[in-house]
């Protein structure tokens, strides 16, 4: 980890006293379908990382112009450096979202940036100047650890109460058993742990709540002391990575059921319920097993699961293992619950499935946009006939695509899919050392929402290899008005 050196003094402004939901006119949209009719995105906020790259600079929030009519389209128009070096910005969320749509006093103003390595949680003011966000305040990791024992914050979701819930993946020493959920008030003051004593998950990562079913489900990555050093398959055998879903009472915070996904669900990372708040089903992406798993509620109020999509590993030459998993590291669901999109970070493809029948997804689109098996790579896949093959990956604006597709974001209308290619600096260095030297990038894919299908937009390419302080790693993306992975309806 880089030395923590303060470079900017934090500033403080009023939050406006945002509280719970009671009337209409708050942030977001009344329903997921209403959100689909929202305005087209003009800006995207992207976490950009120097931690772990060898460049001794703070991570930053990049603002990217995604308005095709703008002269600065497809470029970074603003960079907000964090106050310290060594954070590892990763995921992001909002102080309020569509779960607070009923409260006119609530404002979607602050982008929440948990720092996975340093443990800080930043609040970024995006309202005063959306094209040039500013730092509002940050939550100190020592205060978090002293009051709750938590460290390694990851996913942030806004609650209908105006509070913010953040999953934390371990304790200060990097042990998974110290993980749990941090509850912040509307002005980012630490309240306590959200879960009841004795009800912490085995491992932490992502979570999603569905209030009408009085349920929150969380997933499992692994022990920070393991994953922060890169991926070691032996650590899976040693029990340092997870394979469980934790079913919590909502908002009670008690574990009601522990679902063991077994070998079909190693490293279950991102989780999403269907957006329709009345639905009692959703999906989780198992990274190492490379399965999409559907979970669903039974008539007796318990929950079950089934594998509905399986990405088979490919036999390969010139790699660290004889077989290569796809490594599903991110997925999302369109706001109308018709399509699911997921990435295979190692294989290099993005897939689109129709999930109108959630039990039986149908492949409707697939496109290769990087990966270890693209033409020109030393790694080759081996077919059943013994012949080797690689995938054709196009250039965009004369640039070759580096790394593999990682975080994705979908436009509200479902017609534009954005993708970055950095997972986590230690893993990037291990699997895709090229992006440590040349930086990562954002691409945009046009989506056919009628028949299905994915096509690269040849006019959009944001190259983080050209950044003023050197190549950086772009990770999660957010629109100022919310999106299909930030907003939850109640």
From Swiss-Prot:
Induction: Induced by cadmium (at protein level). Induced by selenium (selenate), copper and hydrogen peroxide H(2)O(2) (at protein level). The induction in response to sulfur starvation is repressed by glutathione (GSH) (at protein level).
List of residues that carry N-acetylalanine: 2
InterPro entries for the chain: Se-bd
Positions contributing to selenite binding: 21-22
Disulfide-bonded cysteines: none
Keyword Phosphoprotein in annotation: no
UniProt GO molecular function: selenium binding
Tissues and organs where the protein is expressed, per its UniProt entry: Expressed in seedlings, roots, leaves, stems and flowers.
Function of the protein: Binds cadmium and mediates lower sensitivity to stress requiring glutathione (GSH) for tolerance (e.g. cadmium, selenate, and hydrogen peroxide excess). Probably helps to detoxify cadmium potentially through direct binding. Binds selenium, cadmium, zinc and nickel in vitro.
Protein name (Swiss-Prot/TrEMBL): Selenium-binding protein 1
Lineage: Eukaryota, Viridiplantae, Streptophyta, Embryophyta, Tracheophyta
Gene: SBP1
